[in-house]
């Protein structure tokens, strides 16, 4: 089958592959076409970095799928950033990178603005202007990411299955915004969501403040069936 590999320069390479090919094999094919050594290649599909020993089938890569090729800098290193949800992000960095640079890389991967990020290493909060070298952060070190909410608050959303979702919101957020956050976490389209608080169904254009929803309030999520009324 054919797949496509898109580089950061916007160039697209076409490769002939089998679903049983490993990621190593694919990197070798890219080397044959483009001359880029496999150890400088990082391949991304559906937001995930692909591991060398796995196959295209493992990642459900079908014909005409597009992979993204990112170059791994020589002299660079990888570090890990662990979030409070337990998710671990891998970043390619240099020891000379500042903490600001690292926060920008996290924003690129996760969409979290730098001014909402606090990074902790060895129990210390890291200051923006300092470098990784200043804090003796070596390859494969793990930083911890804590979110700094701007006047924000947390609320809970309980589903009919009994699952509770935690959301970071502002009192000025509209019900539409909240439904979009639920979609981001749970994949449920906003038009299938009905939110209930204090026995009332919440209307899209209104804000949390309109309904006097405070921090740590619990909303109830009911699904609106497709084709329903």
Curated annotation (Swiss-Prot):
Q: Does the keyword Repeat apply?
A: yes
Residues forming the Ubiquitin-like domain are 1-76, 77-152, 153-228
Looking up PROSITE patterns in the UniProt record yields: UBIQUITIN_1, UBIQUITIN_2
| Source organism, top-level taxon | Eukaryota
Q: Listed GO cellular component terms?
A: cytoplasm; nucleus
Record-linked SUPFAM superfamilies: Ubiquitin-like
Does the keyword section mention Transferase?
A: no
Keywords attached to this entry: Cytoplasm, Isopeptide bond, Nucleus, Repeat, Ubl conjugation
Q: Which SMART domains does the record cross-reference, listed alphabetically?
A: UBQ
Propeptide feature ranges: 229
Cell location? Cytoplasm; Nucleus
According to the UniProt entry, the cross-link of type Glycyl lysine isopeptide (Lys-Gly) (interchain with G-Cter in ubiquitin) is at: 48
Tell me which InterPro entries the record gives: Ubiquitin-like_dom (IPR000626), Ubiquitin-like_domsf (IPR029071), Ubiquitin_CS (IPR019954), Ubiquitin_dom (IPR019956), Ubiquitin_ubiquitin-like (IPR050158)
Q: Location of the Glycyl lysine isopeptide (Gly-Lys) (interchain with K-? in acceptor proteins) covalent cross-link?
A: 76
Family, according to the entry, reads as follows: Belongs to the ubiquitin family.
What's this protein's function?
Answer: Ubiquitin exists either covalently attached to another protein, or free (unanchored). When covalently bound, it is conjugated to target proteins via an isopeptide bond either as a monomer (monoubiquitin), a polymer linked via different Lys residues of the ubiquitin (polyubiquitin chains) or a linear polymer linked via the initiator Met of the ubiquitin (linear polyubiquitin chains). Polyubiquitin chains, when attached to a target protein, have different functions depending on the Lys residue of the ubiquitin that is linked: Lys-48-linked is involved in protein degradation via the proteasome.
An additional note in the Swiss-Prot or TrEMBL entry is: For the sake of clarity sequence features are annotated only for the first chain, and are not repeated for each of the following chains.
> What is the protein named?
Polyubiquitin
